[in-house]
């Protein structure tokens, strides 16, 4: 459990077309936050025999809740209240099998499932009307993302030369529900991620390694939320539900 208090200040200077200062504004935000989190983990390891065969199973469950309340003042005038309630549940299941062979090589096989679910409920209460009467940043977002991965790798060492070859396939199933507007967005995609490592030992203190791998970075729910959020009149952020993952 953790509690916190934070104050931020944003200063805006407005100039006309001739670069003459016409107005200044100061926006102060006082934020109070309260969060709770809990996590449970279970690990099972079975060394199947003396040759190094091993089976490992991991289970994990975590839950977190956060409540943030903000009071915003502009030029020392109380203009709005914001309240954000966020909660998330994460589940993990992973199984790995290691099989060393008599020729010195080793095979590893595994499966991993990450199941994430979260909700973000943001309420905005303006005390001074916005210049745009249609603007309402209040929103409620459900986000669910399940990632299932199968992977295998094979490695061997010949005297001073060693290599490792691996391949992982991932299925991502993503669901976004905008409860405020009753909109739903679903996306599923599969990716293949190879890994190649080559190593050579010159002596006991010097070696060289070449490696290649492919990785995936998925956008967080914050960057997918299409509702506007403003830290000032001129600083506006809006997510995009159509964002694709990036590969490196």
Q: How should each PLM-predicted stretch be described?
A:
Residues 5-21, 67-76, 120-128, 175-182, ...:
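Outer-membrane beta-barrel translocator domains and adjoining extracellular loop/strand segments
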Residues 139-146, 216-248:
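Outer-membrane beta-barrel signature, preferentially recognizing the C-terminal barrel domain
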Residues 37, 88-90, 147, 189-191, ...:
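Membrane-spanning beta-strands of outer-membrane beta-barrel proteins
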Residues 1-3, 29-177:
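Face-selective signature of the C-terminal outer-membrane beta-barrel domain
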Residues 167-172, 184, 213-219, 227-229:
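Active/binding-pocket-proximal capping segment
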Residues 5, 45-47, 208, 216-218:
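A surface-exposed, glycine/aromatic-enriched loop/edge motif typical of exported proteins
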